């Protein structure tokens, strides 16, 4: 009887397990369907947006499309003329960003092994060829095949726009079309050219803020990070300021030649405000002047502080052209505003700094307490602010820990290279009496996912502190290997240092090096370029323990574990609230004034729109943060005051002899070390000085060895 009962129970358990498997499979299938639908919608929206941008400079768009849309939407008592651009330019991009957030949330939840089959690996490697370096130029840096393709398409859009605009200028403005008592031919054409340069500059401005929205779903959905896309912001910024400066100079020449210098101070009540445009241009020029590498690197504080003028630039740009036209280039700025305010909310709290280690190479490792539910990818960065050094300065540093291997700790390594980092090193190295250090952070920011497991082997090339992102990758692979979930690639770390004291950074690679040989296959080739023999004891590491205040919090995601879903909610709900506010104000305030033959002042309309956007973003972001803070931080302060031995200690004595070959007085011959590497897919990662990155890029460039998959990790702005 008992045996029969056990048999029934066993059958019941198998039946229950079968139901669970079927439910899980159905759930994953539903997620896949939703993701495919999102991809389809995204493609439709992108294609529609591209068509609009292509058609915008043509007469067909102005005389037929725009005229038709204004006839249907422009007379609305709720939105008026701005309603057209709200629908055509703002709405699609906000929808796209919201869909991207939902897609990333579903992708994060999916538990499918995408590297199990050879077919998947070959498919990924096929597209990996598009990431190979194609151009290595001083002005552009390292440009991949994909980047060249998109750069050419974007430049084609600008040239197409200029060609259409200039065609209108030189074909329609002729000696016969000019009034007898009006401008000369060259003056009339100069006036028209100035307008067209401004219109083309507005296209670049429309894309300017997307690369610097650090937490944007649009970047993460296409595999970009805020650091890797900073160069796009630089390219776009140079184009914006070149076109806008040319626009301003042309108008200055025109006004001087036509004796209309007083126009420079004009602030039209309902039209274009010249004075506002000049203020915006001056703010832009001040920012632009500090972005050149020689100034930015030598006077980083000047560069940092002057970039806050972007608020002045955008405010007076809107006053200059009016809100209706400004909405064309506003979607990227709107997404940036949401991201910026969320970062502001996160930065208001001090975090728990538990310990620090001071290395002999003037490098500091900071160890923070972390919420175990905060997950981040290798190579992620953290922005750090220490008020006792500077209340305003925020500096990005690579995270060296792994959120999987070290669930309660987050570490960053800071090399003493500038005023801020030198002050921090001096503060920690010269005193044993520091019990507490107030620190605020923003982030982490990094790729939504990594695909290092697809390679047969990984070769990491670093110079100096460029080793930091590779520490996080190695630790992450160590965790993956220890779980036996995937087969990890063979790792070769080629690191170049100036002095033997810099070798102490190798001590931070693993939390516990005694277990490494049983999990991953790693070889370290270290090169000390300026010394023939070791002149430093690498194991002299000073450890400081801090006593966090009760108010200090572990580093946690501002929007909780479902941050992408919350971001989609913020974007969509804030935009809806903004629309409702504008509809009410337009219906009961702006529209009645316009109807009484008194046109509403353009500056006031612009200010109302900007305030409505700000209120909607602040309100929705704050509510989302408070909702997550209430539920997510419950029970957070248990078991986080102290770090376990694994989190603080390492075993440097065993790491160097067993896995490392040290070469003194020579530089690595990268061509010899990289060319001829065996394996169908060899991932080559490089992080270090510009010359080193460019040398590796040339070796792995398009047309070279087909098995080398290049990736540059650069944190140099």
Curated annotation (Swiss-Prot):
PROSITE patterns: FAD_FR (PS51384). It is a multi-pass membrane protein. Expressed in root steele. Detected in shoots, leaves, stems, siliques, flowers and cotyledons. The chain crosses the membrane at residues 40-59, 86-104, 140-163, 232-255, 306-330, 353-373, 564-586, 606-627. It is an enzyme of class 1 (oxidoreductase). Gene3D superfamilies: Nucleotide-binding domain of ferredoxin-NADP reductase (FNR) module. Pfam families: FAD_binding_8, Ferric_reduct, NAD_binding_6. It comes from the Eukaryota. It catalyses: 2 a Fe(II)-siderophore + NAD(+) + H(+) = 2 a Fe(III)-siderophore + NADH. GO terms for cellular component: mitochondrial membrane. Belongs to the ferric reductase (FRE) family. Induction: Up-regulated in roots and shoots by iron deficiency and copper deficiency. PANTHER family: FERRIC REDUCTION OXIDASE 3, MITOCHONDRIAL-RELATED, NADPH OXIDASE. It comes from Arabidopsis thaliana. This is Ferric reduction oxidase 3, mitochondrial. Residues 1-23 form a transit peptide. Residues 198-317 form the Ferric oxidoreductase domain. Its cofactor is FAD. It is found in: Mitochondrion membrane. Keywords: Electron transport, FAD, Flavoprotein, Heme, Ion transport, Iron, Membrane, Metal-binding, Mitochondrion, NAD, Oxidoreductase, Transit peptide, Transmembrane, Transmembrane helix, Transport. InterPro entries: FAD-bd_8, FAD-bd_FR_type, Fe3_Rdtase_TM_dom, Fe_red_NAD-bd_6, FNR_nucleotide-bd, RBOH/FRE. GO terms for biological process: monoatomic ion transport. It is not clear whether or not FRO3 functions in iron import to mitochondria or is involved in iron efflux to the cytosol.
């Amino acid at each position: 009887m008992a045996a029969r009962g056990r048999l029934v129970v066993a059958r019941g358990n198998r039946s229950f397990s079968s139901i669970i498997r079927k439910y899980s499979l159905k759930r994953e299938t539903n997620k896949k369907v939703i993701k495919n639908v999102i991809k389809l919608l995204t493609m439709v929206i992108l294609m529609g947006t591209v068509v609009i941008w292509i058609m915008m400079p043509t007469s067909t768009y102005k005389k037929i499309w725009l005229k038709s849309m204004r006839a249907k939407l422009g007379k609305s008592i709720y939105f008026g003329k701005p309603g057209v651009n709200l629908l055509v330019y703002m709405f699609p991009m906000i929808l796209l960003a919201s869909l991207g957030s939902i897609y990333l949330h579903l992708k994060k939840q999916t538990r499918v092994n995408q590297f199990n089959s050879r077919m998947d690996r070959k498919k990924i490697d096929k597209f990996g060829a598009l990431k190979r370096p194609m151009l290595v130029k001083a002005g552009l840096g390292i440009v991949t095949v994909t980047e060249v393709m998109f750069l050419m398409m974007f430049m084609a859009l600008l040239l197409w726009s200029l060609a259409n605009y200039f065609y209108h200028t030189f074909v329609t403005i002729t000696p016969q079309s000019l009034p007898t008592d009006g401008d000369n031919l060259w003056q009339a054409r100069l006036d028209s050219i100035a307008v067209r340069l401004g219109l083309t500059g507005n296209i670049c401005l429309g894309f300017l803020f997307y690369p610097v929205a650090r937490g944007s779903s649009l970047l993460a959905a296409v595999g970009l990070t805020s650091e890797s896309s900073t160069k796009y912001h630089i390219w776009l910024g140079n184009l914006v300021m070149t076109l806008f400066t040319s626009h301003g100079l042309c108008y200055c020449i025109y006004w001087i030649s036509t004796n209309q210098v007083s126009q420079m101070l004009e602030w039209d009540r309902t039209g274009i405000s010249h004075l506002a445009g000049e203020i915006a241009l001056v703010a832009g020029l001040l920012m632009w002047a500090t972005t050149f590498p020689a100034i930015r690197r030598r006077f980083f504080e000047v560069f940092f502080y002057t970039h806050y003028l972007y608020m002045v630039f955008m405010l007076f740009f809107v006053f200059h052209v009016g809100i209706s036209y400004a909405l064309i280039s506003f979607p990227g700025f709107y997404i940036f505003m949401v991201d910026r305010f969320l970062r502001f909310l996160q930065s208001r709290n001090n975090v728990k700094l538990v310990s620090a280690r001071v290395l002999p190479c003037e490098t500091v490792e900071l160890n923070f307490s972390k919420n175990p539910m905060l997950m981040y990818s290798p190579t992620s960065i953290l922005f750090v602010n220490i008020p006792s050094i500077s209340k305003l300065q925020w500096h990005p540093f690579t995270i060296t820990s792994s959120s999987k291997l070290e669930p309660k700790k987050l570490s960053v390594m800071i090399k003493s290279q500038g005023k801020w980092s030198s002050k921090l090193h001096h503060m920690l190295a010269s005193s044993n009496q520091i019990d507490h250090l107030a620190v605020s952070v923003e982030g982490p920011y990094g790729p939504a996912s990594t695909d290092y497991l697809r390679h047969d082997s990984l070769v990491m090339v670093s110079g100096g502190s460029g080793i930091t992102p590779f520490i996080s990758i190695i630790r992450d692979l160590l965790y993956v290997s220890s779980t036996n979930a995937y087969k990890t690639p063979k790792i070769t770390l080629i690191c170049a240092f100036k002095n033997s004291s810099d070798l102490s950074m190798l001590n931070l690679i693993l939390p516990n090096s005694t277990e490494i040989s049983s999990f991953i296959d790693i070889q370290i080739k270290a090169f000390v370029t300026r010394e023939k023999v070791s002149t430093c004891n690498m194991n002299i590491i000073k450890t400081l323990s801090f006593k966090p205040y009760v108010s200090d919090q572990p580093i946690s995601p501002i929007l909780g574990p479902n941050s992408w879903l919350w971001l989609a909610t913020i974007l969509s709900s804030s935009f809806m609230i903004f629309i409702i506010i504008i509809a009410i104000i337009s219906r009961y305030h702006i529209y009645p004034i316009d109807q009484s033959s008194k046109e509403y002042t353009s500056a006031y309309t612009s200010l109302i729109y900007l305030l409505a956007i700000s209120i909607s973003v602040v309100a929705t972001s704050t509510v989302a943060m408070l909702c997550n803070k209430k539920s997510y931080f419950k029970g957070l302060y248990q078991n986080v005051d102290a770090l376990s031995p694994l989190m603080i200690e390492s075993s440097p004595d065993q790491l160097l002899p067993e896995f490392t070959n040290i070469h003194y007085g020579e530089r690595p011959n990268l061509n010899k070390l990289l060319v001829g590497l065996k394996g169908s897919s060899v991932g080559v990662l490089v992080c270090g000085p510009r010359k080193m990155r460019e040398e590796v890029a040339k070796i792995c460039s398009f047309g070279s060895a087909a098995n080398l998959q290049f990736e540059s990790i650069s944190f140099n702005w």
